[in-house]
Amino acid sequence: MLNENLEQQAQAIFKSWFIDLEPFSNRKPSDWSVSTLGNVSIMGAGGDKPQNVSPIKTDLYKYPIYSNGLSNEGLYGFTDKPKISEESVTVSARGTIGFVCLRHIPYVPIVRLVTLTPKTEIISAKYLYLWLKQL
C-alpha cells in the first residue's frame, strides 16, 4: 500500500513538472529538446524462452524471465543467464498491451516483451518509466 502511494505521488509530481510544465509557466524551457525513444534508449523485444528454465529461483537459476502480463509483473520463471543486465523499462506488446514496468535487476524478456534500456548519458530508467506511465 505504501509503495502504491509513493508511486502515485511520484507520477503526480512527474506529470506536474515534465508533462504539464507547471513550474515553467506551462512552456518548455528553451534548453530542453524533444527526442524519440530510439534516440534516448536501446530498444529490443523478447523472443523465445531460454532452454534452461526453473519455476523457482535457485542459486543456478537466479535471473527472472519476464513475459507480457500483469500477474507478478509478468514473471514467467528463472534462468541461468540474463539477456538485459542494465536497469531498464519493459512494455507489454501482447495480451495486456501497454503495461509498463521498471526493471532493476538483470533479466530475460520473452514473448515480444518490449525492452527500453536508456542511454544513461541522456536519460535515466526512472525518468523513462515515469514518462511512459503517462501515456
Regions found by a protein language model. Name each.
Residues 1-50, 56-71:
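Non-catalytic DNA-recognition/assembly elements of restriction-modification systems
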Residues 27, 55-56, 81, 106:
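Generic marker of residues within folded, mature protein domains
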Residues 44, 132-135:
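Alpha-helix boundary/capping residues
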Residues 50-53, 76-78:
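Short secondary-structure capping/turn segments at boundaries of alpha-helices and beta-strands
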Residues 68-133:
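A short beta-sheet element
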